Amino acid sequence: MMEPFVSIIVPVYKVPEQYLRKCIESTMTQTLKKIEILLVDDGSPDQCGEICDEYAEKDKRIRVLHKKNGGLSSARNYGCKAAQGKWIMFVDGDDWIEPDMCQTMYSAGEEKQVQLVMCGIMKDYGKSATEYKFYLEDGKVYKGQECKWLQQQLLVYNGNIAVAYSKLIDRKLLLDNQIFHDEVLRQGAEGLEFNLRLFEKLESAIFINKPFYHYIYNENSISASHNEVNHEFVIKCFEKIKAFIDTSDNKEMLKP
């Protein structure tokens, strides 16, 4: 297969079958065909790995990466390092994306020559769904110092941009600056910590105000669980975030 335009990275660990199948099928039916789909089986003890292998038999664009369990951050990094596309997109294994997400975001990224494309998010609770409120201008290209303002917005969750998903990221930006998820931060605010480092190096971005990404609220998921281990990881995340802010080139804007 020729080098794909977009590499979709899907971490998979103990995802209920109906969610996992919908997630994978939503990536397979993208209108942008020149993609690769990396299903990262993070040592899931159930049938997730076999389900991933099943889909790989049906679609040559799918690669299944089986690895020892290391957590969400580890799985994302594993996929990112194996990716071959010009652009990286993270999709969690229990979420799904609209058919035109890759095409629309890829076209915007190429046309505007930016390093990051962001889109809207729909939060699905099962019987109801709510579109996240974003306070970014639709179609606006952010450059230079405006990207520093975006970095500041991560800390106030303005527009819910402090997540790894719902983004198309220039792979070269990640690799050149060695921007990977901190694998010590297995859960909690790991997306915020990752994005702070990403936006530190960011020179251009665009926001598309369409909810292409469907976040499925699963009360049994790692991120939704409230236990001592989860709280411990959250504390570690914010300790890392404080340390980052103290040494950031943009620390005056980031401090309260």
Q: Model segments located where?
A:
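Cell-envelope/extracellular polymer assembly enzymes that use nucleotide-activated donors
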Residues: 4-7, 26, 36, 193
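Short, well-formed alpha-helical segments that are part of the catalytic scaffolds
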Residues: 15-29
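Short alpha-helix within the catalytic core of nucleotide-sugar-dependent glycosyltransferases
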Residues: 21-25, 49-53, 77, 85, ...
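A conserved acidic beta->alpha catalytic loop
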Residues: 41-50
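Glycine-rich, basic loop-to-helix element that forms the pyrophosphate-binding segment
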Residues: 67-83
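Short aromatic/hydrophobic "clamp" motif used to bind/position activated sugar donors
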Residues: 88
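Donor-binding/catalytic cores of nucleotide-activated saccharide
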Residues: 93-206, 213-229
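C-terminal subregions of glycosyltransferases and related glycan-biosynthesis enzymes
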Residues: 214-256
